[in-house]
Amino acid sequence: MMTFISCAKTMTGRSKMQTPVTSTPQFQTEAIQNALDMSQFSAEELERLLRVNSKIAAENYMRFQDFCSDSPSALAALLAYTGIVYKRIHPQDFTPEDFQYAQDHLRITSFLYGLLRPLDQIKNYRMEGDIKLPERGGISMFDYWKPILTDTFIKEIKARGGILINLASGEMKDLFDWKRVEQEVQVITPEFQVWKKGKLTTVVVYAKMCRGELTRFIIKNRIENPGDLKGFKWEGFSFDAGHSTDTHYLFSLLS
């Protein structure tokens, strides 16, 4: 069984924690070229392309300018990303065995790096999937990565029993030929919703928290059977058998 999650927009380049081992991203060469291409844009252009304010644009302009230098140093992906999902995974208390299990069974999508393992060393960046780089033929990052990642992704899932737990955001499917993925492996997508006035509603912050907590649950408990996910409970969220299917696991909360 393999789990995959999305990258986060917020990142840090520092951590007091040391991972037991480190690894190099599989698509490091492509990531470096992508970063070099991004370094050609001005801060004003990045503000528009990334849809951010001028401060964040200036910060990422400098990140891309310094990407190929020795400073800042790289950090393991699971520690570098600091979004809500990653805060809830909380790798700061992982044992070496937890990190190794995550390295073997968790994958992280990235518009810059393509597909990452948790201990892959990465640098801070900001990227969007719809950005079109001239050096990449003017196609979006979604279309650039799709033919590169699909076969690798399917092969890795099959090597881990042919079951994928999809905890990534919806847009990340566009990095792959998702129709092929669903044809060749079993995809199970957990969702997290709240009952409000008799209707199920998605509260984004809760959904992100639960994705992180479920990822942590999988890693800490070495989950290999998707049926064991049904035992996940967190802050009132629990498996809702009446609104779940073989490919869609709903965890609901009574508000």
Swiss-Prot record:
Cited InterPro entries: YaaA
Gene Ontology terms describing biological process: response to hydroperoxide
UniProt signal peptide: none
One annotated Gene Ontology cellular component of this protein: cytosol
PANTHER family: PEROXIDE STRESS RESISTANCE PROTEIN YAAA, PEROXIDE STRESS RESPONSE PROTEIN YAAA
Stated family: Belongs to the UPF0246 family.
HAMAP family in the cross-refs: UPF0246 (MF_00652)
Protein name, per record: UPF0246 protein BVU_0413
Gene source species: Phocaeicola vulgatus (strain ATCC 8482 / DSM 1447 / JCM 5826 / CCUG 4940 / NBRC 14291 / NCTC 11154)
